[in-house]
């Protein structure tokens, strides 16, 4: 069976993990955590990057820093992972879902302003598949209405919009290093902070509400509890694993881009005939090959194709069930306007195997089986 995902390994993971163990410091904020944070800062230009135990926790930390409170409203797409909404619902906010663009599956920037009310506190753009939302328009709206922008860039590290790293446009940006992401630490994430004036508070909340980070830098002679916080530090073992990935980030990026481009070229004929849809990369957007998906006619055709590919030992999967259709989404959120594309397009989308080291032979086989399905089984 060709797996849908294989967590990336580059060969130095065990070396660095053993190094962390020998250092006798395997809790958070050790040498490998600092290396990873510095790498993110240098490669994105953000003022500060704090490693976290997940992208979910990075988003929760951003919601706390943004002072999201009960009764506030936060605008986001419904086509996203539950964590995007959870972080704000936990603060008592109501999520306001806005329809997506059918080309990128990102929030439709032209529908955001109409969803703004006196209760709105933040916009949360989600860069689906590492393809940027229209950040110029979104940031303009945020400035006009004095709103925070918190980027869900879980899938978007090493992707850019007009040359600028995703995750660095908003007040805060959130990365994921889950095992399904391009760069992994098993479970983990990072919070990117744009304004250096917010760094100290973020460090305090991340460190159980203490000023422990200042203590370790020698800025104070002891640390104490200074405000409410939580524990969002990953262990050094996780950070050591991630450092192996970041040290080979360009190699991973280039390998995935080769796979993405090969998929696209081999499936272009089906797209040109109108049989399937392929990903759209708007001008000014440079993606990171996080995902390769196709779009088929409808839900039934997708189910048939998944079953067919499984019979050919290929694992393919659909993606999000729109949040507004879920039990929690109906209670805790509201869809603003018309669901013209969110549900329909989500039912068409099928993700194909994509991981570091996938290789040309597997991609050729996968695309041949897709062509066989549409020519022999579906009769196109």
Segments the model singles out, each with a brief description of its role:
Residues 151-185, 214-215, 221-226:
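Conserved active-site segment immediately N-terminal to the catalytic lysine
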Residues 1-26, 224-226, 353:
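N-terminal "arm"/small-domain region of PLP-dependent enzymes with the aminotransferase-like
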Residues 34-38, 43-47, 110, 122-126, ...:
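PLP-dependent aminotransferase class I/II
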Residues 50, 75, 96, 149-150, ...:
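Structural detector of well-ordered beta-strand residues that form the stable sheet scaffold
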Residues 26-73, 87-91, 97-99, 164:
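Phosphate-binding glycine-rich loop
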């Amino acid at each position: 069976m060709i797996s849908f995902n294989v967590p990336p390994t580059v060969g130095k993971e065990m070396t660095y993990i053993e190094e962390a163990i020998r250092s006798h410091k395997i809790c958070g904020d050790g040498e490998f955590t600092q290396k990873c944070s510095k790498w993110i800062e240098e490669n994105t230009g953000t003022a500060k990057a704090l490693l976290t135990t997940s992208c979910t926790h990075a988003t929760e930390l951003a919601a706390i820093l943004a002072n999201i409170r009960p009764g506030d409203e936060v605008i986001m797409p419904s086509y996203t992972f539950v964590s995007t909404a959870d972080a704000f619902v936990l603060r008592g906010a109501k999520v306001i879902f806005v329809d997506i663009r059918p080309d990128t599956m990102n929030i439709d920037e032209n529908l955001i302003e109409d969803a703004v009310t006196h209760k709105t506190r933040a916009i949360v753009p989600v860069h689906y598949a590492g393809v940027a939302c229209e950040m110029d328009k979104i940031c303009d709206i945020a400035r006009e209405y004095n709103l925070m922008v918190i980027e869900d860039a879980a899938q978007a590290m090493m992707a850019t919009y007009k040359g600028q790293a995703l995750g660095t446009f908003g007040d805060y940006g959130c990365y994921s290093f889950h095992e399904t992401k391009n760069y992994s630490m098993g479970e983990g994430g990072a919070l990117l902070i744009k304004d250096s004036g917010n760094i100290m508070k973020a460090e305090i909340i991340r460190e159980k509400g203490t000023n422990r980070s200042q203590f370790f830098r020698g800025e104070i002679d002891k640390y104490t509890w200074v405000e409410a916080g939580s524990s969002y530090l990953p262990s050094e073992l996780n950070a050591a694993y991630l450092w192996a990935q970041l040290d080979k980030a360009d190699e991973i990026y280039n390998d995935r881009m080769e796979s993405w481009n090969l998929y696209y070229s081999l499936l272009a004929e089906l797209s040109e005939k109108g049989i399937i849809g392929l990903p759209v990369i708007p001008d000014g957007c440079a993606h990171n090959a996080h995902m390769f998906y196709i779009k088929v006619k409808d839900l039934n055709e997708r189910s048939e194709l998944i079953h067919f590919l499984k019979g050919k030992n290929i694992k393919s999967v659909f993606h999000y069930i729109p949040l507004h259709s879920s039990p929690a989404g109906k209670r805790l959120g509201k869809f603003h306007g018309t669901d013209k594309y969110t549900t329909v397009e989500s039912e068409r989308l099928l993700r194909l195997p994509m991981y570091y080291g996938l290789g040309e032979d597997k991609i050729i086989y996968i695309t041949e089986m897709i062509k066989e399905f549409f020519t022999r089984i579906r009769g196109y």
